[in-house]
Curated annotation (Swiss-Prot):
HAMAP family: ATP_synth_alpha_bact (MF_01346). PROSITE patterns: ATPASE_ALPHA_BETA. Pfam families: ATP-synt_ab, ATP-synt_ab_C, ATP-synt_ab_N. The record marks 370 as: Required for activity. The keyword Methyltransferase does not apply. GO terms for cellular component: plasma membrane; proton-transporting ATP synthase complex. This is ATP synthase subunit alpha. One of its GO terms (molecular function) is proton-transporting ATP synthase activity, rotational mechanism. It comes from Rhizobium leguminosarum bv. trifolii (strain WSM2304). F-type ATPases have 2 components, CF(1) - the catalytic core - and CF(0) - the membrane proton channel. CF(1) has five subunits: alpha(3), beta(3), gamma(1), delta(1), epsilon(1). CF(0) has three main subunits: a(1), b(2) and c(9-12). The alpha and beta chains form an alternating ring which encloses part of the gamma chain. CF(1) is attached to CF(0) by a central stalk formed by the gamma and epsilon chains, while a peripheral stalk is formed by the delta and b chains. Its main location: membrane. It catalyses: ATP + H2O + 4 H(+)(in) = ADP + phosphate + 5 H(+)(out).
Length: 509
């Protein structure tokens, strides 16, 4: 048999050319035990804390406990298909999510995978979920209003861009409704406002019923607010690690806007459930429990999340991320562990009370206990001019109302105070899904503090408000425009507003 050397070398060259260069070298470990969403893995000696690892079948996990003889991994998904002895691979990547404008209008899970059936998300950028918050130098103090469209909040407990304002209350007191109204209120700016004013919204649902999240998305869609919103959902049926991760994932998505000179608003609904899922993970990882069986670093869990909401300085693009975390209390107990923690981290809180809710005062904001630590620097001058007196009058009203229950013969001044207070309380009521523009709120509150409601029966206050706003939109749009552009009530505007109120009050009675 005749063997030609040239032929052999050609065959060898061909073989070498087609030799697979994509041999994959990865560090692997073995599952020692698995259960309750936690896997103990032997090996993975060089794994990093917070690194993503991969189980057979493409299930992902995150290395949290790095011990001398094994690694504690939390599993993002079902642990049913993972068995003892399975091989676990390092991915080399810290947990990250897709970010960018491509996510707007979509519903994603805590890892950024779409769950709304609208096809894949073609995001080109990814960001780590757990990054350090901006330091002191890149920040700027909060000075621009973040309008929620709710009179009770924008007038008395103003929220600024870059602030963290806690929404706290028992179940069924309208906490999510406040977030929803704040989202819907951004529609007017998105439709015809300047680019620099637009506020992109991120809603993080933690441990809620799927039906509740679906309802939230439906309302946003019907009212045209989904196009500038991102929904991150880790529902009650998702494993605890997903519920723990969702707020961080949503925050990373919001930070993209903050770091690119845009503005974002993120609502965490709610952080009590995130703390519960973190407690579950920590106890299963055998970390020592502390107060109420929460781990020692549950304060750090929330502080490092909420510190990422910030107003950046001009060198950094002047973007902002505003956070509205929600905490659900049990039986109005705000002195429990998680509520006190989050109250101490945030820049103020909006207290919602069951009693007020059932009295028909909605939004059920307790004006006495709620504060905003940013205060009037997050209001336009026009709002400061009218809302300055309303807070004092309401405080006096609450004090007097307590005394007035005992005495029947009240002097005229007290009677006047009680009358005014009852009407102002009525004025701050607002139906859901009907946020008001700032200039409309200013006009309405102006009527309240200048005595135009004092002669009306309390039941007619709402009707007067609706009528007056319709009148202003048709007849006095120049007044509203003046308040919007000047951001203050000049003497000229004040005269016109008073004249408009006088003429409307005559026709109303």
């Amino acid at each position: 048999m005749d063997i030609r050397a040239a032929e052999i070398s050609a065959i060898l060259k061909d073989q070498i050319k087609n030799f697979g260069k994509e041999a994959e070298v990865s560090e692997v470990g073995q599952v020692l035990s698995v259960g309750d969403g936690i896997a103990r893995v032997y090996g993975l000696d060089n794994v990093q804390a917070g690194e993503m690892v991969e189980f057979p079948g493409g299930i992902r996990g995150m290395a949290l406990n790095l011990e001398s003889d094994n690694v504690g991994v939390v599993i993002f998904g079902s642990d049913r298909d993972i068995k003892e002895g399975d091989t676990v691979k390092r991915t080399g990547a810290i947990v990250d999510v897709p970010v960018g404008p491509e996510l707007l209008g979509r519903v994603v899970d805590a890892l950024g995978n779409p769950i709304d059936g609208k096809g894949p998300i073609n995001a080109t950028r990814r960001s780590r979920v757990d990054v350090k918050a901006p330091g002191i130098i890149p920040r700027k103090s909060v000075h621009e209003p973040m309008s929620t469209g709710l009179k009770a909040i924008d007038a008395l407990i103003p929220v600024g861009r870059g602030q963290r304002e806690l929404v706290i209350g028992d179940r069924q007191t309208g906490k999510t409704a406040i977030l929803l109204d704040a989202f819907l209120n951004q529609k007017a700016i998105h439709d015809n406002g300047p680019e620099g004013e637009k506020l992109y919204c991120v809603y993080v649902a933690v441990g809620q019923k799927r039906s509740t999240v679906a309802q939230f998305v439906k309302v946003l869609e019907e009212r045209g607010a989904l196009k500038y919103s991102i929904i991150v959902a880790a529902t009650a049926s998702d494993p605890a690690p997903m519920q723990f991760l969702a707020p961080f994932a949503g925050c990373a998505m919001g930070e993209y806007f903050r770091d690119n000179g845009m503005h974002a608003l993120i609502g965490y609904d709610d952080l009590s459930k995130q703390a519960v899922s973190y407690r579950q993970m920590s106890l299963l990882l055998r970390r020592p429990p502390g107060r109420e069986a929460y781990p020692g670093d549950v304060f750090y869990l929330h502080s490092r999340l909420l510190e990422r909401a910030a107003k950046m300085n001009d060198d950094k693009g002047a973007g902002s991320l505003t956070a509205l975390p929600v905490i659900e209390t049990q039986g109005n107990d705000v002195s429990a562990f998680i509520p006190t923690n989050v109250i101490s981290i945030t820049d103020g809180q909006i207290f919602l009370e069951t009693d007020l809710f059932y009295q028909g005062i909605r939004p059920a904001v307790n004006v006495g206990l709620s504060v905003s630590r940013v205060g009037s620097s997050a209001q336009i001058k026009a709002m400061k001019q009218v809302a300055g007196s309303i807070k004092g009058e309401l405080a006096q009203y609450r004090e007097m109302a307590a005394f007035a229950q005992f005495g029947s013969d009240l002097d005229a001044a007290t009677q006047r105070l009680l009358n005014r207070g009852a009407r102002l309380t009525e004025l701050l009521k607002q139906p859901q899904f009907s946020p008001l523009k700032t200039e409309e709120q200013v006009a309405v509150i102006f009527a309240g503090v200048n005595g135009y409601l004092d002669k009306l029966p309390v039941a007619s206050v709402g009707k007067f408000e609706q009528g007056f706003l319709s009148y202003l939109r048709s007849e006095g749009s120049a007044i509203l425009d003046a308040i919007r552009t000047e951001k203050a009530i000049s003497d000229d505007t004040k005269g016109k507003l008073t004249a408009a109120l006088d003429s409307f009050a005559k026709s109303f009675s």
